[in-house]
């Protein structure tokens, strides 16, 4: 009798995706982050579902409903902080996952890469809407500033913003629709993740060497399931340390003040994981130019496969490209720091230089390094 996991129509799909999947024998811990993102997504959906049971999406009660969750609901405080800090963990894993794709040339799997970019945009949209829901000062003003960026679109901009707001300012209609979208988007993300995996399993995983590993595969279970469990344990440990010891470390104190349309906070800034894009937006004095730079800072990932000039896929054996990659990482950290600083003398110029460097490294330096390294191969 055939094993049920190989014959049952449903279990067979799971078997081919997570158990008998042929995986390269040499993939490192950088390949753990895909499964960690899956765990983060499931955690966010579960905690979010429980929060939605007690949350009310009305401007008069939203803030107090979040307070009620933390004070009166059994274990409400831990569910709320797991959800808030779980988002931070999600983005840490997401950035590392994208970085690993860049470093090892995984972007040559075009369908997988493009679905990944759509996923990145969707997750960012979901996180932004989630930040608006507690209806604190930063929620309200963050929503006002970011949605207002659409008014930079010529001709239809103002109408578009008012259509999204459902009125002439961020108000009850905006909060209600943001809650509806914030609830539905994770399930759309889940569907996209399945498509992402479907395309990945068409080609098989990449590996650190960047060369085909068809002749040297091992089953996913038990080798990589055990390896992934170690990643899960480390992720959950870090998340619990954050939640139980300093749950507000990554949040903004202004969000503990109820939203007040008549009082603007001194520094409006998004959550830490959007600061790099926010810094790029602020570094351009023109509104439309800033919005375009903001969108391109993420969308630039889509043209990276076209900018690949090297004869080698991975950066493992390409020291010049490695230098450019780590310079890019340092530049993104600089942008993240600048995004959280006030708009005044030293920070403005640092932000502008870091923004120029960001686009230069991707569009100019990495392709040139690839060509130089191709010449090294002739020696």
UniProtKB/Swiss-Prot annotation:
InterPro entries, per database record: Cyt_b/b6_C, Cyt_b/b6_C_sf, Cyt_b/b6_N, Cytb/b6-like_sf, Cytochrome_b, Cytochrome_b_C_euk/bac, Cytochrome_b_N_euk/bac, Di-haem_cyt_TM
Top-rank lineage group of the source organism: Eukaryota
Q: What GO biological process, any one, is recorded here?
A: mitochondrial electron transport, ubiquinol to cytochrome c
**Any GO molecular function:** ubiquinol-cytochrome-c reductase activity
Compartments it resides in: Mitochondrion inner membrane
Keywords of the record, alphabetical order, are: Electron transport, Heme, Iron, Membrane, Metal-binding, Mitochondrion, Mitochondrion inner membrane, Respiratory chain, Transmembrane, Transmembrane helix, Transport, Ubiquinone
One GO cellular component assignment for this chain's record is: respiratory chain complex III
Q: Where mainly found?
A: mitochondrion
Q: Which residues bind heme b b562?
A: 83, 182
Q: Which CDD domains match?
A: cytochrome_b_C (cd00290), Cytochrome_b_N (cd00284)
User: What Pfam families does UniProt report for this protein, alphabetically?
Assistant: Cytochrom_B_C (PF00032), Cytochrome_B (PF00033)
* Binding sites annotated in the UniProt record for heme b b566: 97, 196
Query: Where are the membrane-spanning stretches?
Result: 33-53, 77-98, 113-133, 178-198, 226-246, 288-308, 320-340, 347-367
Per UniProt, the cofactor note for this protein states: Binds 2 heme b groups non-covalently.
Where do the annotations place a ubiquinone binding? 201
Q: Which cofactor does it need?
A: heme b
* Record bears the keyword Signal: no
Topology relative to the membrane: Multi-pass membrane protein
Task performed by this protein: Component of the ubiquinol-cytochrome c reductase complex (complex III or cytochrome b-c1 complex) that is part of the mitochondrial respiratory chain. The b-c1 complex mediates electron transfer from ubiquinol to cytochrome c. Contributes to the generation of a proton gradient across the mitochondrial membrane that is then used for ATP synthesis.
Q: Quaternary structure per UniProt?
A: The cytochrome bc1 complex contains 11 subunits: 3 respiratory subunits (MT-CYB, CYC1 and UQCRFS1), 2 core proteins (UQCRC1 and UQCRC2) and 6 low-molecular weight proteins (UQCRH/QCR6, UQCRB/QCR7, UQCRQ/QCR8, UQCR10/QCR9, UQCR11/QCR10 and a cleavage product of UQCRFS1). This cytochrome bc1 complex then forms a dimer.
Q: What else is known?
A: Heme 1 (or BL or b562) is low-potential and absorbs at about 562 nm, and heme 2 (or BH or b566) is high-potential and absorbs at about 566 nm.
Q: Which family does it belong to?
A: Belongs to the cytochrome b family.
Identify this protein by name: Cytochrome b
């Amino acid at each position: 009798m055939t094993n049920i996991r190989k014959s049952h129509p449903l279990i067979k799909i799971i078997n081919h995706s997570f158990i008998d999947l042929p995986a390269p024998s040499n993939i490192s811990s950088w390949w753990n982050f895909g499964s960690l993102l899956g765990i983060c997504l499931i955690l966010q959906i579960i905690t979010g579902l429980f929060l939605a049971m007690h949350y009310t999406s009305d401007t008069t009660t939203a803030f107090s409903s979040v307070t009620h969750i933390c004070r009166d609901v059994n274990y409400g405080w831990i569910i709320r902080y797991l959800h808030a800090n779980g988002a931070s963990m999600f983005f840490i894993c997401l950035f590392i996952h994208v970085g690993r794709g860049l470093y090892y040339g995984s972007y040559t799997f075009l369908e997988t890469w493009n679905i990944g970019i759509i996923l990145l945009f969707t997750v960012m949209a979901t996180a932004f809407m989630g930040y608006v829901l507690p209806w604190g000062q930063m929620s309200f003003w963050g929503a006002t500033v970011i949605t207002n960026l659409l008014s930079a679109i010529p001709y239809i901009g103002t109408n578009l913003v008012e259509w999204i707001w459902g009125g002439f300012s961020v108000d009850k209609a905006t909060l209600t629709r943001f809650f509806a979208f914030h609830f539905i988007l994770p399930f759309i993300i889940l569907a996209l993740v399945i498509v992402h995996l479907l395309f990945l399993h068409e080609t098989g995983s990449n590996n650190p060497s960047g060369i085909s590993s068809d002749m040297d595969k091992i089953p996913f279970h038990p080798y990589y399931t055990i390896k992934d469990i170690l990643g899960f344990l480390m992720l959950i440990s870090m998340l619990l340390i954050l939640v139980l010891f300093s749950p507000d470390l990554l949040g903004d104190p202004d969000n503990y003040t109820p939203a007040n349309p008549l009082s603007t906070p001194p520094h409006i800034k998004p959550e830490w994981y959007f600061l790099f894009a926010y810094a790029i937006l602020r570094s351009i004095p023109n509104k439309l130019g800033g919005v375009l730079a903001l969108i391109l800072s993420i969308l630039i990932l889509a043209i990276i496969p076209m900018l690949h000039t090297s004869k080698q896929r991975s950066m493992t054996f390409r020291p010049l490209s490695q230098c450019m990659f780590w310079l890019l990482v340092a530049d993104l950290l600089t942008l993240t720091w600048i995004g959280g600083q006030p708009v005044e003398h030293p920070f403005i110029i640092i932000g502008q230089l870091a923004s120029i460097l960001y686009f230069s490294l991707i569009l100019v330096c990495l392709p040139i390094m690839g060509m130089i390294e191709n010449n090294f191969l002739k020696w």
